[in-house]
Amino acid sequence: MTSGKEDYLKAIYIISEDHELVSNKELSDMLHVSPPSVSEMIMKLQKEGYVDYTAYKGSKMTRKGRREAGKLFRFHALWEVFLVEKLHFSWSEAHEQADGLEHQTSDMLAERLDEFLGHPEHCPHGDPIPKADGSRKGLTFRTLSDLKEGDSTTIRRIVEDYSLMDYLPVSYTHLTLPTIA
């Protein structure tokens, strides 16, 4: 599979977490490509069994597509953990490097990397790392806005805003802050 197809699968996967059908416009905006390019790639992905496309409604990932996208997120997350924990990259630097490395990673390399890292459950910013089959645990975290004055909490996940991530300490683990009134 080409890295371009993999990027589309990842984008569809991300957008479909909010709603099942993903429009070509959403993909065009996210990937910064023209609408005709999106249409062409969606047809290729449908032909290969990764998405089901309904005209004027959008694309929906098939089980095969979701599994493949989950593997890509696994590869990406494992590389982020390695780059942050072992090579001391910032979150944004690790993300950028992992974007390239994920496309070059085999299942065997990912398995060995996972073992070397001690089977991490979360990437550096707190998202669960998918299992080898591409499946992923759901998130059950509360947002900071759910807290009441005087509460304290442990931040376990940071939404991928790299300007914010570079401002915060590299490891999200056990970063405990009092509620700010």
List where the protein language model places each region:
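Key DNA-contact positions within bacterial/archaeal DNA-binding proteins
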Residues: 36
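Basic, amphipathic "hinge/linker" alpha-helix immediately C-terminal to the N-terminal HTH DNA-binding motif
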Residues: 57-76
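Single conserved hydrophobic/aromatic residue that forms the stacking wall/gate
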Residues: 174-181
